[in-house]
Amino acid sequence: YLVSPAAYAALGAYMFLLILIGFPVNFLTLYVTLEHKKLRTPLNYILLNLAVADLFMVLGGFTTTMYTSMHGYFVLGRLGCNLEGFFATLGGEIALWSLVVLAIERWIVVCKPISKFRFTEDNAIMGLAFSWVMALACAVPPLVGWLRYIPEGMQCTCGVDYYTRAEGFDNESFVIYMFIVHFLIPLSVIFFCYGRLLCAVKEAAAAQQESETTQRAEKEVSRMVVIMVIGFLVCWLPYASVAWWIFCNQGSDFGPIFMTLPSFFAKRPAIYNPMIYICMNKQFRHCMI
């Protein structure tokens, strides 16, 4: 054991709790939305995509981690490590790029940079396809030789290899690609869209350009998406920061807990994304009841 058996037991219990909550609430989100026609709006397609991403993390990642934590190390071999790392990365990236699509949708709908534009079903499907393509562009390369997935932290979960420094082993290019294309760029787009959105909401309120009902509806949707973005950042920024520090300080000594804590902190979006959607969407709650 790298740490005490009690730490592995706590980790297993934590993963069991995430599965116990994450699977039902995400499945409920999918079921209720597909069951009620009035919930099948273009915007909700993107929110459903978040639920699918969370289920990937729950079924492909959390179950594996709970099982390996019972043994105190990653017992599933290279194939299991690749699958766990792939599903965890894919789920996180689908969620991130879905939030990018939601931010762009909110910016276009509220700020109206394109006159008479409506976010249609075709636009939503294009957004879904875009989020999957970008997520796969991050999750697949380690499977085909551009870097690799390895056990990290307490060795119960797998992630991208930020650590190895050896002759003939080049991990710099992929890590830089991932941080720029799959972290900094999407976050920059999100911050730009919501910066413009806040300005537009204040201007519309001051000018009273739209009805009070319309303004209230747009504000509620925007508030829900903003909270999802904040939650994503709270969970993923510690992991990204620690991973970047390890990459920039390869060869430095650090304990297994150093990477384990932010790694498992980053798994919580699978729970809070659907709970935010359920708590802040009155129409969904009405259909659920």
Curated annotation (Swiss-Prot):
Position of sequence motif 'Ionic lock' involved in activated form stabilization: 105-107
Topological domain ranges for the Cytoplasmic compartment: 33-44, 105-123, 196-223, 280-289
GO cellular component: membrane; photoreceptor disc membrane; plasma membrane
Post-translational modification: Phosphorylated on some or all of the serine and threonine residues present in the C-terminal region. Contains one covalently linked retinal chromophore.
Site (Plays an important role in the conformation switch to the active conformation): E84
Keyword 4Fe-4S: no
Disulfide bonds: C81-C158
One example of a Gene Ontology biological process annotation: absorption of visible light
Residues bearing carbohydrate: N171
Compartments, record wording: Membrane; Cell projection, Cilium, Photoreceptor outer segment
GO MF: 11-cis retinal binding; G protein-coupled photoreceptor activity
Keywords: Cell projection, Chromophore, Disulfide bond, G-protein coupled receptor, Glycoprotein, Lipoprotein, Membrane, Palmitate, Phosphoprotein, Photoreceptor protein, Receptor, Retinal protein, Sensory transduction, Transducer, Transmembrane, Transmembrane helix, Vision
Highest taxon, organism lineage: Eukaryota
Extracellular topological segments: 1-7, 68-81, 145-173, 246-257
PANTHER family in the record: OPSIN
Job of this protein: Photoreceptor required for image-forming vision at low light intensity. While most salt water fish species use retinal as chromophore, most freshwater fish use 3-dehydroretinal, or a mixture of retinal and 3-dehydroretinal. Light-induced isomerization of 11-cis to all-trans retinal triggers a conformational change that activates signaling via G-proteins. Subsequent receptor phosphorylation mediates displacement of the bound G-protein alpha subunit by arrestin and terminates signaling.
Family membership noted in the UniProt record: Belongs to the G-protein coupled receptor 1 family. Opsin subfamily.
Protein name, UniProt field: Rhodopsin
